[in-house]
UniProtKB/Swiss-Prot annotation:
It comes from Aromatoleum aromaticum (strain DSM 19018 / LMG 30748 / EbN1) (Azoarcus sp. (strain EbN1)). Belongs to the PAL/histidase family. This is Histidine ammonia-lyase. Disulfide bonds: none annotated. GO terms for biological process: L-histidine catabolic process to glutamate and formamide; L-histidine catabolic process to glutamate and formate. The gene is hutH. It is an enzyme of class 4 (lyase). InterPro entries: Aromatic_Lyase (IPR001106), Fumarase/histidase_N (IPR024083), HutH (IPR005921), L-Aspartase-like (IPR008948), Phe/His_NH3-lyase_AS (IPR022313).
Amino acid sequence: MTAVCLHPGRLTLAELRTIAFSDSRLELEPACFPVVARGAATVAAIARSGEPAYGINTGFGRLAQTHIPDDQLELLQKNLVLSHAVGVGEPLSAPTVRLVLALKIASLARGHSGVRMELINALLGLFNAGVIPRVPSKGSVGASGDLAPLAHLSALLLGIGEAYVDGRHVPATEALAIAGLAPMTLAAKEGLALLNGTQVSTALALVNLFAIETVFRTALVAGALSVDAAAGSFKPFDARIHALRGQPGQIDAAATYRQLLEGSGINLAHRDCGKVQDPYSLRCQPQVMGACLDQMRHAARVLLIEANAVSDNPLVFPDSGEVLSGGNFHGEPVAFAADALALAAAEIGALAERRIALLIDATLSGLPPFLVTEGGVNSGFMIAHVTAAALASENKLLAHPASVDSLPTSANQEDHVSMSTFAARKLGELADNTATILAIELLAAAQGVELRAPHRTSPRLQAVLALIRSRVPHYDIDRYFAPDIASIKDEVSAGAFARHCPLSFDSERVADGEASRSATPDDESL
């Protein structure tokens, strides 16, 4: 089990990937403890004073002007959680919920939500016991935070709802007992602090960012293999071309193609042929994939900032004793980042689909029609390409930005919302579709490279070819093809092909202790 020490405000992408996908145990930086205590004391003092403060002794949303008497403050927080637990749809995945828990813990531990350490310890207890609250995936509009899904997560602390433990579906009371916890009574503001925030949108976007990073690296490998399968030129990857444009992602993508294709015997065999220019799907790969890379890097930066943010409302400032209402719960940054990732994922798949079309077209590729030597009685990759085209078309619709939509809610008090949760959630389908398109391309490109025998591709890509053939044999006559596509797609999603790509992302680099973090902030800035 991997131990991850949470440093609120200074989490890294590598830590977030580890938390989501590894068997990890969370610890909290001790410097958080006095900060949390000061925030909780500030809220308790306001509650005792009777001074009106939103979320502490008032109603919520359009009911914010309603004063709540002291003897109903605990009931107010409980009712808030119960009334907001109205999510629908399939439950969020275990990696997503683990990340939601970690992000919520980190946000609360910065001391500006005014909750007690007891509440944070309960969330840590759930995580470390392997308890995964059952959180429906639909029902949030991304402002005021991810209310409905976070209410389902929070209800578990009250002994209400359901969870998963070791794959078993159990009631909340049993889940709490497994974690060594009893149902809690929430203090002033604690229910609101649990529900307010962008942690669900952010966790969804991060989990799918990590999937799209794997897809991107796989696409570089598949695209390079297709260059050799189509007997394409290496000249478009020359560093001098890309330096003149200066786009960072393009420069990095071109360098990756050069590394992947270095030493190709196929290229040497046709280096002096009369072909002048390849189709764009081969020649412009650095430009298209580089633009995707720049989008992904920007989205990752935005999401990392949000993962370290306090997106609660109102916010507690212990130094001045103030509680300030704002709008940090609005998910627009997450929605924009997710929409940018959607564009990148769709374009990765669109370019791969075009390369498949090129490979099966004998006129363009110089290979046998549909990549099978005895065409006619055999249809080869004809309909596998149709599947890729169908998925690429779906991706175009899924790439439509969710953030441009808004519906007013809460009697027009919440009159503009981000739709960040949907923007982040649909990335999963985009990543999955694109992984399947790439599986088909890898199979087609492997077929094309083998049809170039006796010439061989580069040493790096020969290893990729060996991986493909360890799962799926050469296609010489028609056979039941769906299991082959599924087998390679599983390897794509698991990162087996991405590991052959020399380019990597920040989330895949193991943090080098404190060197990977910004300077340690003082307690008040945690």
